[in-house]
């Protein structure tokens, strides 16, 4: 690639002029040192992949947002109202009424399976923004977030920069998932990076060690989740608005299973509501096969297992249509609960 072609590519990607100068210097140095060719090309490709100027346009329509939330989540009236208030603040900010309109960072806290991650996805869909998730479970180093210096042979950017590349936009919804599950040995360092990420005074010039150049994160919409707040640093909590997720009652889980999970699993397994029917008095047996469960993970797995067994039965020619009743439910429940 000629210097002129490289310059044109970098300029077209809206890379800042001083960074273009730096890249061109690196390229010139690599010509006299073969060992620098591969890492320099890797760096250039990474810079070209970053969404320096790419943004999506928000669709902040509250009635549409409510419909999306209702489509994905049963009940949760208080939480949905809080999310709509949150979106209203963002809408006012977008109109230019910025004074006092900075939206806090939502922090969904609750047991596994209570809908934290899917709420974040629903917010992304409601806003028309792209979505990326950063899992914190078992994260063992602050470098996982901030990246490694290019002096290391296998250096890479941190999870945040990778998330932006995956999203392909500068303003995605980024889910910081399970903040409470980072490795204990590096918790303090990771929390320190989080403070910087979530602080609007600092994240406008976030420096990933691999990039070695400030990147503006001010348009990223961060949402966080955790099972509890016990292991979250106070400085991080101060930047988050905790929203406690409720546990589901059996009646709520019945409605969720019947009206939300079951139709999705029918589609996922190639069935229809004509080939698989579940009698209404069977749902209590499906909802609580293992005793108390605050979330719906067990419910989702159980319904999925039932659908898979029916799909196999139909493919093997044993049935054309299956109706599950109290009399035959046990043969369709997964073995660990049947």
For the regions a language model picked out, list residue spans one by one.
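Walker A/P-loop
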Residues: 98-136, 165-166, 195, 199
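Hydrophobic positions in the central parallel beta-sheet of the AAA+
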Residues: 106, 174-177, 224
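AAA+/P-loop NTPase substrate/partner-engagement loops
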Residues: 126-156, 163, 183, 252
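Extended, charged alpha-helical coiled-coil/arm scaffolds that mediate oligomerization and mechanical coupling
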Residues: 1-93
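Short loop/turn elements that form and flank the Walker-type P-loop nucleotide-binding site
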Residues: 101-104, 127, 146, 154, ...
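Conserved catalytic/switch belt of AAA+ P-loop NTPases
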Residues: 176-215
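Conserved C-terminal "switch" segment of AAA+ ATPases
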Residues: 12-18, 55, 168, 228-238, ...
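AAA+/SF3 P-loop NTPase mechanochemical coupling elements
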Residues: 167-171, 189, 206-225, 276-278, ...
């Amino acid at each position: 690639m000629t210097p002129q072609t490289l310059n044109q590519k970098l300029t077209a990607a809206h890379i800042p002029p001083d960074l273009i100068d730096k890249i061109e210097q690196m390229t010139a140095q690599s010509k006299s040192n073969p060992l620098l060719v591969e890492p320099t090309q890797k760096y250039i490709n990474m810079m070209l992949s970053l969404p320096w100027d790419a943004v999506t346009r928000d669709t902040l329509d509250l009635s549409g947002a409510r419909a999306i939330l209702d489509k994905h989540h049963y009940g949760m009236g208080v939480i949905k109202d809080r999310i709509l208030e949150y979106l209203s603040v963002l809408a006012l900010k977008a109109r230019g009424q910025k004074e006092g309109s900075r939206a806090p960072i939502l922090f969904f806290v609750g047991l596994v399976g209570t809908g934290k991650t899917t709420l974040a996805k629903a917010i992304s869909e409601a806003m028309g923004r792209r979505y990326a998730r950063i899992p914190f479970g078992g994260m063992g180093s602050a470098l996982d977030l901030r990246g490694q210096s290019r002096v290391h042979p296998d250096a890479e950017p941190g999870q945040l920069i990778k998330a932006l590349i995956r999203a392909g936009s500068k303003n995605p919804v980024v889910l910081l998932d399970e903040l409470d599950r980072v490795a204990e040995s590096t918790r303090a360092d990771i929390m320190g990076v989080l403070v910087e990420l979530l602080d609007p005074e600092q994240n406008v010039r976030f420096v990933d060690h691999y990039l070695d150049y400030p990147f503006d994160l001010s348009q990223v919409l961060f949402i966080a989740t955790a099972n509890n707040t016990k292991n979250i640093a106070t400085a991080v909590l101060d930047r988050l608005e905790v929203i406690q997720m409720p546990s589901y009652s059996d009646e709520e889980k019945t409605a969720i299973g019947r009206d939300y999970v079951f139709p999705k699993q029918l589609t996922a397994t190639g069935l229809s509501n004509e080939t698989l029917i579940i009698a209404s008095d069977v749902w209590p047996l499906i909802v609580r096969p293992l005793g108390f469960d605050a979330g719906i993970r067990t419910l989702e797995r159980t319904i999925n297992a039932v659908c898979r067994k029916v799909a196999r039965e139909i493919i093997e020619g044993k049935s054309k249509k299956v109706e599950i009743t109290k009399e035959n439910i046990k043969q369709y429940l997964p073995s660990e609960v049947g």
